[in-house]
UniProtKB/Swiss-Prot annotation:
Entry keyword set: Amino-acid biosynthesis, Cytoplasm, Histidine biosynthesis, Hydrolase, Lyase, Magnesium, Metal-binding, Multifunctional enzyme, Zinc
Gene name in the database record: hisB
Protein name: Histidine biosynthesis bifunctional protein HisB
Major location (coarse): cytoplasm
Start and end residues of each stretch annotated as Imidazoleglycerol-phosphate dehydratase: 164-352
Gene3D superfamilies, per the entry: HAD superfamily/HAD-like (3.40.50.1000), Imidazole glycerol phosphate dehydratase, domain 1 (3.30.230.40)
Obligatory cofactor(s): Mg(2+); Zn(2+)
Pathway: Amino-acid biosynthesis; L-histidine biosynthesis; L-histidine from 5-phospho-alpha-D-ribose 1-diphosphate: step 6/9; Amino-acid biosynthesis; L-histidine biosynthesis; L-histidine from 5-phospho-alpha-D-ribose 1-diphosphate: step 8/9
Taxonomy, superkingdom: Bacteria
Length: 352
């Protein structure tokens, strides 16, 4: 689904002149950092829509031709750098006209909005005024300001990182799972489960996956650890799947890893299709209080919730090392598969 940035012009894309009217070429100056930021956001799959209030176009104070020359020059500047706007909406009225198209009202965009399906949760208004914030509220999308202290670099980083995080609360009669992930964060994860070995394994996934994982898990261990491990895997898969959004630009595939005498190999495809094949033999019933039969089940539950195909095989003699290798290689595979290094969706179907 389309992700849209509704971007103001004066004060956001170009510097606001002293008289608040861009009516001559010598008044045009791009805002600092706007080009690299928009290129980064464009690569991340965002569509750009320009929405601007231009007071009194066509009046003696602001002739149509003066506006047109400057506006075309601005568009040419951006297009010369590979930045294009899918649509441009300009309100020519003054506040006194009390029109339906002047921001923060949305009348100017109504025909476009009726014909366009887009992901509001991943779309933003970017502007320098309070009216831009109100405009975002009226559209039902997010907002980020541009100012001397909140730069385009900060805006691009915030949008890209925000688009790749998710939280899942899973509460059943057997377990309570509170989990969140942020895929583009190198913060130290905070993981708390009542099974220390399982906690340690999840720390390996987050560390080697290069993402921030926050987890608080509790369950009916007096019955069995099955429910806790299964529900944690389901919550983790759901959270990563949500955080990936439309999967635009991801690598999709990944990875292999040795550990001491153990060797774990994995092939993962975040395709939207669930399948898991786990090959490995454990002769011990428990490792660190965790049943070894739950290792394959963790990967199967994760595969189902994530919507991924996972093939994993592990060999070795030290069961701790074998299991740890499985979780580390999962992290490495997720890091590779979730990384965004493309500017397209890696599927000929057009959807993952």
């Amino acid at each position: 689904m389309k992700k849209i940035l509704f971007i103001d012009r004066d004060g956001t894309l170009v510097e606001e002149p002293f008289d608040f009217q861009v009516d001559s070429l010598d008044k045009i100056k791009l805002t600092s950092g706007v080009i690299p930021a928009l290129l980064q956001l464009q690569k991340a799959g965002f569509t750009f829509i320009m929405v601007s209030n231009q007071n009194g176009i066509g009046t003696v104070a602001f002739p149509e031709e003066d506006f047109a020359v400057c506006h075309e020059f601005i568009l040419d500047l951006f297009s010369s750098q590979g930045i294009l706007f899918d649509e441009i909406f300009i309100c020519p009225h003054t506040p006194e006209n009390n029109c339906i198209c002047r921001k923060p009202k949305t009348g100017l965009l109504e025909p476009y909005l009726k014909e366009t399906v887009f992901a509001k949760q991943y779309s933003w208004v970017i502007g320098d005024r309070d009216t831009d914030k109100e405009f975002a509220d009226n559209l039902g999308v997010n907002f980020l300001p541009i100012s001397k202290t909140h730069t385009w670099e900060m805006v691009a980083s915030a949008i890209i990182n925000d688009a790749r995080k998710a939280s899942v609360q899973r509460k059943t009669k057997e377990t309570t799972i509170d989990l969140s992930v942020q895929l583009d964060s190198d913060q130290t994860s905070v993981i708390d489960t009542p099974i220390p070995f399982f906690t340690h394994m999840l720390e390996q996934v987050a560390k080697h996956g290069g993402f921030d994982l926050r987890l608080q898990a509790s369950g009916d261990l007096e019955v069995d650890e099955h429910h806790l491990i299964e529900d944690t895997a389901i919550a983790l898969g759901e959270a990563i799947r949500t955080a990936l959004g439309d999967k635009w630009g991801i690598n999709r595939y990944g990875y292999t890893l040795p550990m001491d005498e153990s060797l774990a190999t994995i092939a993962i495809d975040i395709s939207g299709r669930s399948f898991c094949d786990f090959k490995g033999q454990f002769t011990r019933e428990f490792i660190g209080g965790m049943a070894t039969e739950m290792i394959p089940h963790f990967f199967q539950s994760l595969s189902s919730a994530l919507g991924a195909t996972i093939h994993i095989e592990v060999t070795g003699t030290n069961h701790h090392h074998m299991i740890e290798a499985c979780f580390k290689v999962l992290g490495r595979a997720l890091r590779q598969a979730c990384s965004r290094t493309n500017n397209y969706l890696p599927s000929t179907k057009g959807v993952l």
